[in-house]
Amino acid sequence: MASLDLPYRCPRCGEHKRFRSLSSLRAHLEYSHTYETLYILSKTNSICDGAAAAAAAAAAASGFPLAPEPAALLAVPGARREVFESTSFQGKEQATGPSPAGPHLLHHHHHHAPLAHFPADLVPASLPCEELAEPGLVPAARYALREIEIPLGELFARKSVASSACSTPPPGPGPGPCSGPSSASPASPSPADVAYEEGLARLKIRALEKLEVDRRLERLSEEVEQKIAGQVGRLQAELERKAAELETARQESARLGREKEELEERASELSRQVDVSVELLASLKQDLVHKEQELSRKQQEVVQIDQFLKETAAREASAKLRLQQFIEELLERADRAERQLQVISSSCGSTPSASLGRGGGGSASGPGVRGPGRMREHHAGSAVPSTYAVSRHGSSPSTGASSRVPAASQSSGCYDSDSLELPRPEEGPSEDSGPGGLGSRAQATNGGSERSQAPRSSGLRRQAIQNWQRRPRRHSTEGEEGDVSDVGSRTTESEAEGPSDVPRPGPAVAGPLNSCRLSARPEGGSGRGRRVERGSPSRSNEVISPEILKMRAALFCIFTYLDTRTLLHAAEVCRDWRFVARHPAVWTRVLLENARVCSKFLAMLAQWCTQAHSLTLQNLKPRQRGKKESKEEYARSTRGCLEAGLESLLKAAGGNLLILRISHCPNILTDRSLWLASCYCRALQAVTYRSATDPVGHEVIWALGAGCRDIVSLQVAPLHPCQQPTRFSNRCLQMIGRCWPHLRALGVGGAGCGVQGLASLARNCMRLQVLELDHVSEITQEVAAEVCREGLKGLEMLVLTATPVTPKALLHFNSICRNLKSIVVQIGIADYFKEPSSPEAQKLFEDMVTKLQALRRRPGFSKILHIKVEGGC
């Protein structure tokens, strides 16, 4: 249907906006226009009613028979509806074109539109048009009205018949029945009117029913809308609650997700800890097995040591028993010698004046010569007995001869008593070996028993001394005590050849001895006594007492624990202390530190250090600088000034030296010291050389490696700050690995050490157990991986001194080196930053130390990681 066929149009929009019903029009006005439009529409309906009445009057005046009267149309309620219907369709007729006449329109409606569509709200006659626009009406009631079908043709026909009957006046006077309002009441209604009224009543009833239904529908729709609104409100509240619950659930899900991630991380951490614990447990089991094996070895060693001690104690007991027997035999021989001496003195006492006269004379006549010869016979015959006599007097507490005899040189030879029987160079051999010599005179004077006693006693004494000299030397205290006793007896024999004022057994013997010495001189001379030169074998030897031997043995046990300075002071106490303090067995560990020494002093020590196995020179200083001597001249004059004395020490120690330490001796001991050690001490096992002025180079390392192949511990890191920091380089590390593949402990350092040299060192030294890095560049995880890839599988101790290291590098070392038992990190802020006093450097250094300290909380690091921070943080 086109828009012009619709019955209602909008008064605001015009003809182009038409509607099927008033409810649609009202809805359009309410939503498209303001409420004023509804008021205008109600007024327009009233005007339309007036216009319809005027149009009906005009049609009646024109003479159209079918046009009803306006009064009748307005008086009858149905007519009003018809007039309103005609006015409602007026716009439609105007839009379609002018109609020829009113009757044609009615005829058209009567024949072509028997039924007309009226709105339900216009059906009741008592409901005016103004009530349609009342503001009190519910909008839903106005929009929900429906159309009612009415038979318009029948109604118009009946209406026209009624109008014609009313318009024809009856004969007689007076106005007709339809002339006025007063004439209509007495007239009886016609059947058509009755039928019309009945139909109109039925239409009203039907319309009212429709309206009631519409009102119920409106109320129902309102209730439904209210219920829907309430339900929507409840649904919105429920939706908001659900949204809040959803947000809470989302947050809870996020929290659970985070907790899940934390639990997964914790689980992974626990798994890693379990792995580390398993590895640690395995390593502990392996260590336990090693410890058990080591314990079994130690137990075997203890058993062997106990057996050795028992055997040594048995040998010592037997040696003491033999020594006691030997001393008792010596005492018995001394007694016999005294008795023989008394016999000889009594035999010589018959002619004392002649002997003294011949001894004091200076002529070279025959009797003068024979006199000294006879005196020499008596002296030679009493040589051995006089020795024992001196021993007895020296051992007695009353004489104190051992304390009055001056100390002799300890380097004297170990000669035996046979030297007393040899002739002096000044004397002729005919006096001792000829027919009138010593042997024949002794036999003629003393008899056969006395003649055989002197050779027998001298032979026994010589055999005893040889047995002591051939005794094997050990480094134990028991063996060293024996060395002291042996050397004490031999040295006392040489020391007994002191001044001539040593007390003699008796005045009867002194005279013949002195006269013999004087007469033995080829140049002759006066009768006054003259001293024999020190160390001359013509003097009688002294045998020390057992008490002195025990005292020297006790001193030796004590002096082995004294340092070098104390030993030098102890040698100035007395002869016995001097003897023990300068015995080579005491100077096994030589330590010189914090002192000013010269080369001559070291050369003097060399004569006592023949058995030294450890030599330590630390922080030694040369002579003081002169007032007029410049620093350059002083440095040139003192450079290597102790190397000559060190060479004497090394030459004296020889193959006995096992440990050599030279540290903090700048300029006075250079790297030439290691070259000297390689020449003289080829049995070295531990070498330490640290210098700030002359660090070792690859040439010196090559020389040391060529001469000393048994070194297992090497400490050659330069001191910091070093005057030649690049001298110790990767080439030195490579040379160390080639020279000593069985190295166990090593200390290197310096700016010249790089990852290449460390990797080569780790590859060659597969048995390395202790590694110390001093002032090396930063050790990162990459450097640690490169070094551990080549070796260090058996490393037990890692020391990083002033060497920056990252926590990951330490973790890598701990994971690769299974036998690692200790990691020592000594760091300072100056090792990381050039400006340690700046706040940023201090803060970064504190963070680094905190990270390193955090490693101690990891499993396996708490007991092996030791961090030492210089100055604290």
From Swiss-Prot:
Boundaries of every F-box domain copy: 548-592
Biased composition (Gly residues): 357-371
Pro residues compositional bias, start-end: 168-178
Coiled coil: 207-349
Keyword Coiled coil: yes
Spans annotated as Disordered: 85-110, 163-193, 345-540
Entry-annotated residues carrying Phosphothreonine: 477
Compositional bias (Low complexity): 179-192
Entry keywords, A to Z: Coiled coil, Methylation, Phosphoprotein, Ubl conjugation pathway
Swiss-Prot/TrEMBL GO biological process terms: chemical synaptic transmission; dentate gyrus development; gene expression; hippocampus development; neuron maturation; neuron migration
Top-level taxonomic group: Eukaryota
Biased composition range(s): Polar residues: 85-97, 384-414, 442-456
Residue numbers carrying Omega-N-methylarginine: 358
GO-annotated cellular components: synapse
Phosphoserine modification, residue list: 476, 760
Oligomer status and interactors: Directly interacts with SKP1 and CUL1.
PANTHER family the UniProt entry points to: F-BOX ONLY PROTEIN 41, ZINC FINGER PROTEIN
Functional summary from the UniProt entry: Substrate-recognition component of the SCF (SKP1-CUL1-F-box protein)-type E3 ubiquitin ligase complex.
The protein's name: F-box only protein 41
Organism field: Mus musculus (Mouse)
Name of the gene encoding the protein in the UniProt record: Fbxo41
